[in-house]
Amino acid sequence: MINKVLFMLVTFSFIFAETASINGKVQYEGKVPRAKKLNMAADPICGKAHTEPVFNESFLVNGDQFMENVIVWIDSPKHSSEVPSEPVVLDQVGCKYVPHVTGIMQGQELMIKNSDKTLHNIHSMSKVNSNFNFAMPAKSDPATKSFAKNEDPFYIKCDVHPWMKTWVVVLEHPYWAVTDADGNFSLDTDKLEPGTYDLCFWHEKWDKAMKGSGYCSDEYKTSVTIADKAVDAGTKIFKRPAKKK
C-alpha cells in the first residue's frame, strides 16, 4: 500500500513538473546552403583544439531541416519573475563562443570564460546598452557583465579571431529558449499569468529582414494560449527571405 502511494505521488509530481510549458519546433523550408568550413590557420592553438573540420554555425539544420540556434521568446508577458540568480555563461572553447546564441534577462549576470590556451578579445556590438571591449588571456578568471536595458539581438565578437561570434537578446523577463540540434524548444511558463501571448522567433540569417519588417512581426511570431498545462506551439516555418526588387 505504501509503495502504491509513493508511486502515485512520484507520478503526480512528474506530471506536475511537466505541465506549465510551451513546446515546439522550428523548420527551414527551401534549399539548404552548403556548410562552410572555418579556417583557423591564423592561430595554431585554435586548429590544434579540433580533430575534425569545424564549420560555420550561422546556419545549422538537421537531415529533416529542423533549425538549430533559433532564439524564441515571449513578447511582453505578464509575469512575476525575479532576475535569475544564476548567470548566463558564455565560454570560449576551441576558439568558438559557446553558446552561439543566447538570451539574458536585464540585470542578470553574464559570466564570460576563456577555456582556451590562447588570447581572446570580447567585443560587444550593442546599440542600446553600454559596449564592452576587453582582452582575455589564457587562464584568466571569469569576467562578469550585465545589461541594464532590453535590446534586440546583437552580437559579441572576438577581434583576435574574426570567425568568432555569438548573438545575445536582452529581455525584461526570463521566458526565452534556443532551439536544439533537432529544432526543439521548450519554455517554462510556470510563473506566467494564463492568457494569449505572442512567441517571437529570431535567427541571425534573417536579422536584416526582421529589422526591415520589425522584430516579432507577423511573419516571425506565433500566438499561443497558455494555462496550467503543456502547450504545443506546433512547428514554425522559416523561408528564405525574398530578395528586394
What do these predicted ranges mean?
Residues 4-13:
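Sec-dependent N-terminal signal peptides
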